[in-house]
């Protein structure tokens, strides 16, 4: 990001700021806030500023998928980036993760938690369980959220939801744990606030029949709702929300009867609140309305038992309660029923989650997300705010312990060089509230509640006196009249003491439980399983005690996870978009400890791990720690040091402690992870490549077997084509985008390409023209290339759908002509890979149409030209046309003469062929059977077996007409055409298949290693047939073979090796290898050069490789060597190279 952009938009990560002060942090957050960049990082900690409106650009599916598989530094700050880091930790490292979201009420914590769930559901591939958590939100918000002065939809409970994952990283269920429900809100609300949403939803959304059945009225008529004089909320439609709640209840699988009973209990709580008491005399209470009331005795009297459980005689007394005690019992009953109802609803959600998760492979890994009410500071703060702020204080302590205190202590213990950072440790505040020795505020409060249980008046004052006496000089406590204040991490808060003791009692006596257990509402009875036979109850637990217990359980759950933090900031109290209250935000920056957090991040280390764990994860990045067997035998610390040194990381980026590796910068860790991803990716590619190679080779063998069965007994064969490897793509079609565009111009862009090469097509005048042939799974394409303004352009001349091909025709001789018969007009072309072309056409024809393609063999073939005229191809034997066919044209007839080839009965089936073979067979790898342009033992490649352990041996062949020495049998070899027994380097091989690859082979196999050569054959090898790529060199004539073990030197130079392979052990005359052992005996002197014949070019030809000649039609070329395989060595304008014999004619 440029300087101008930083000035306007701020930096993404506060660690990168040049100057670190609270003012600079606030200014950076403000810039980003007004640019709708609501997220900012402090290393791995995310700061989220509530925009009070939806920012669509941050919530699209495209935005979400930009973070998938990316590290945090690769994309702008976002909840998605943090969620991705948590998901990666679970999936890659099998470490439980948790996301702790903190901030004031209304700062956007719940929305942030929803985005975490949304992201995990989107990227994990199995979002059923996660979606269930999302669907539970309307239900849990209805029963657990309420309007407060700061937030219209404030969570009044803590929610810690876990998403469980199986070994594949897929969600397999989950669990929700609720903490600290603010049940006192059921019976009392501050003015301007509301009780839980469900009460108002039920009153507004119930049907007329339900309202009549449950005697529902306007909220003003219920004492539990009319205290705050707030019944509606701007932006909340209670009728619509009730419909959403009903739908969520159905999704969670609650029965209709369970739903009915739940809503009846909600209504019953409201009616219970309308029960009023008056003084009945002598300090006892009486029900104000004398209508029969089932709970009257339970509310007016408390049952006391004397004598104890072990006494011989026990007495029971009904002790009347005063008005305050009766009202307290009523409210305690209402709060308890509601609290247990909420717990039951959460349990139903968990049951639904478990059903979604199924009983599959659970790996016990999970991501937990904590969404809990934020720190609260109101004009009047009571017991509820005290409890909420205590929990937030504990969360802040947890944050400090992990990110500030523990980190610095670890550096000291590990002997890491470190500059200590000062910070405020709020442990002293936590001890003030929860301490036991000396007793903290909760302990003092419980003591007052136990000693003054029979009265309410004066309890709060007594409690306040005890606090003032217990903390007379505490730096974080200050007593006042009827109130006290605590200096929290978020600031000083004054709490009104009134109501503390009453709300802390939270007492429900056995007599009330016994009455409930007699209810006809079986659902309600199931929520109170207490054994009331033990009539002498122990001292009841208080709200404060339960709160501390729940908070300890929460801290324990978080401590088992690797934490991620989202620190939410509320920019204003008006809930307005683009409204920045500098004072409010600065205060939050202070109490969230962002300044200290930035300082620690800048001075500290972003990552640390035990030596064993670090080495286990990253050892494959160095051959010294990975090795052949993947094990490091030395000490783990030494292995880590070796690994980091081999990676070339500067020592300023990492340090080794006593038991751990410390990485200073996140970018360094990201670099390690990226290296690991690349390594895994490369390994995956190798495995895929090996598999595809095996499949491809197996497919080639099947095709060659098909071709052998098709041609055997029907057509004479060319020597070089018998064992030629099929390469399919001879013009590098995959990289030829202009040609691809040309093919797609027909409107078919999803066809799979099966074969590509250049062919010579006979036009309507019988003259050959070069075309690019492309065979796909659906059609055959012929394209013409020409130069235009120095650029090669393509023009699609014809597309023939495979289903419209009537038949194919070939002669019975060894020529390379193929005729495709079509109802419009036929296509006649020549190509030295005709067998491969016909095989592929037959295969794809049957796959597309389900029937066999007719193939005719005839030496008199009638075809229809593009102008509609009938033409005839007549084939006959002409032994003088051994180098290339002779062609004579008449008006409607073309006579083609060709020398005798291998007998029709020649079997070109792969050796040791079995239909299931291919794992290590014949002709695989680069430069397998006849790879490159080489014929058997001839110059550019010869016979060769496939790579990967294939066994190679040449096919027995009949003696050809041309006096070409036969190759010696190949032996098994490995790698890139390892040593093989090569025959004499006779000529330059016939047309072969592109680039020969590594393989086990004899002559011409792979990039042949040295091979044992036979006696040198005369002359330089003849050219291979036209085809792209280069085969690997083999035995005799392999590569430009180095000196080797050979027989006695033969005359002349051996044929060149296939492709441009490395040196091979050639016999005399093989490759360029010297004769004899070592460099062998001196070769025989070359005979006097005869007069060189000349030829005339019939067509233009562009060289395909560096050792070929480019020429134009009519050029005169001096011929130095003719090879019956079809390539002649010529010279033009002082440059020597190879020319295709069928492009020239003798002068």
Swiss-Prot record:
The modification Phosphoserine is found at residue 315. Residues 901-954, 969-1089 are annotated as: Disordered. Keywords: Actin-binding, ATP-binding, Motor protein, Myosin, Nucleotide-binding, Phosphoprotein, SH3 domain. Residues 9-677 form the Myosin motor domain. Residues 551-573 are annotated as: Actin-binding. It comes from the Eukaryota. SUPFAM superfamilies: P-loop containing nucleoside triphosphate hydrolases, SH3-domain. The keyword Transmembrane helix does not apply. Residues 715-900 form the TH1 domain. It holds the Pfam family Myosin_head. One of its GO terms (biological process) is actin filament organization. ATP binds at residues 103-110. GO terms for cellular component: cell leading edge; cytoplasm; myosin complex; plasma membrane; plasma membrane bounded cell projection. Residues 916-951, 975-1079 have a biased composition (Gly residues). One of its GO terms (molecular function) is actin filament binding. Residues 1090-1147 form the SH3 domain. SMART domains: MYSc (SM00242), SH3 (SM00326). Myosin tail domain binds directly to anionic phospholipid membranes; myosins I could therefore move actin relative to membranes and vice versa. TH.2 and SH3 bind tightly to F-actin; this together with the nucleotide-sensitive site in the head, allows single molecules of myosin I to cross-link actin filaments. Myosin I heavy chain is single-headed. Dimer of a heavy and a light chain. Inability to self-assemble into filaments. Belongs to the TRAFAC class myosin-kinesin ATPase superfamily. Myosin family. This organism expresses at least three isoforms of myosin I heavy-chain, encoded by genes MIA, MIB, and MIC. Myosin is a protein that binds to F-actin and has ATPase activity that is activated by F-actin. This is Myosin heavy chain IB.
